[in-house]
């Protein structure tokens, strides 16, 4: 399985931002230069990027189609993108706008019967299932919903295996406790998922601080890694990460 590095840009109100543990009240802004940043990522050798619509994630209705179209027209980047997917037509629209893959998150937890059908309709290579997880006191990985305020009632392992049986090829898993914290990725979680889901490209997300973390995610069996805050704050060289 190939390993893909996904430099990430999260967009809110037209600005590149990062949230701390998904909290909209804990935002750091990095400017309104998303397209030049994407062009710079391509110039450094990136083949894919991860683009998140934070406004749509909150209110629905994907708003980044113009930016996505510009990135596709002005760079060779493939784009994995999501935020605000509320139904099948949203997936179709985002793919039509030029996405290489559409990320389906909260809906993948709330309406799995529907999302399983999209893997067949659009093709498993065009859908990334995103599951945000938090470990409970018993060591089980729960899937918080509604702004990470309550658990979905199904564990990460159970739902991930269900999607794997349905043909899922790409799983983005974020350890909520590490999101935006630059504390290192949860390697034991990704080792577990990679062993549990043979043939699925597991994307490590949350806490990656440097090239060593990227290399460790690859050794853990991951098929990719999302690079956010560490790149934006120039704590990591993208070219070195791509060479892992």
UniProtKB/Swiss-Prot annotation:
Single GO molecular function: 1-(5-phosphoribosyl)-5-[(5-phosphoribosylamino)methylideneamino]imidazole-4-carboxamide isomerase activity
Tree of life domain: Bacteria
Q: Where in the cell is it found?
A: Cytoplasm
For the keyword Amino-acid biosynthesis, the answer is: yes
Q: Which gene encodes it?
A: hisA
* The protein's name in its UniProt record: 1-(5-phosphoribosyl)-5-[(5-phosphoribosylamino)methylideneamino] imidazole-4-carboxamide isomerase
Query: Could you provide one GO biological process annotation from this protein's UniProt record?
Result: L-tryptophan biosynthetic process
Instruction: Describe the reaction catalysed, as an equation.
Output: 1-(5-phospho-beta-D-ribosyl)-5-[(5-phospho-beta-D-ribosylamino)methylideneamino]imidazole-4-carboxamide = 5-[(5-phospho-1-deoxy-D-ribulos-1-ylimino)methylamino]-1-(5-phospho-beta-D-ribosyl)imidazole-4-carboxamide
Question: From what organism does this protein derive?
Answer: Stenotrophomonas maltophilia (strain K279a)
């Amino acid at each position: 399985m190939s390993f893909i590095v996904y430099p990430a840009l999260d967009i809110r109100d037209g600005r590149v931002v990062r949230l701390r543990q998904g909290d909209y009240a804990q935002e750091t802004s990095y400017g309104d230069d998303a397209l030049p940043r994407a062009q710079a990522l391509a110039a450094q050798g990136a083949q894919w990027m991860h683009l998140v619509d934070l406004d749509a994630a909150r209110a629905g209705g994907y708003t980044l189609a113009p930016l996505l179209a510009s990135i596709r027209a002005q760079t060779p980047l493939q784009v994995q993108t999501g935020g605000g997917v509320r139904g099948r037509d949203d997936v179709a629209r985002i793919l039509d706008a030029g996405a290489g893959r559409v990320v389906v998150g909260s809906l993948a937890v709330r309406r799995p019967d529907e999302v399983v059908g999209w893997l067949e309709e659009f093709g498993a290579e065009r859908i990334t299932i995103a599951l945000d997880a938090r470990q409970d006191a018993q060591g089980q990985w729960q899937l918080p919903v509604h702004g990470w305020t309550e658990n979905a009632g199904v564990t990460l392992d159970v739902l991930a295996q269900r999607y794997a049986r349905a043909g899922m090829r790409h799983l983005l898993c974020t350890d909520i406790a590490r999101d935006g914290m630059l504390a290192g990725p949860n390697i034991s979680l990704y080792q577990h998922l990679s062993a549990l889901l043979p043939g699925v490209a597991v994307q490590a997300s949350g806490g990656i601080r440097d090239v060593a973390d990227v290399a460790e995610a690859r050794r853990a069996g991951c098929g990719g890694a999302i690079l956010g805050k560490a790149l934006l704050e120039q704590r990591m060289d993208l070219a070195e990460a791509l060479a892992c």
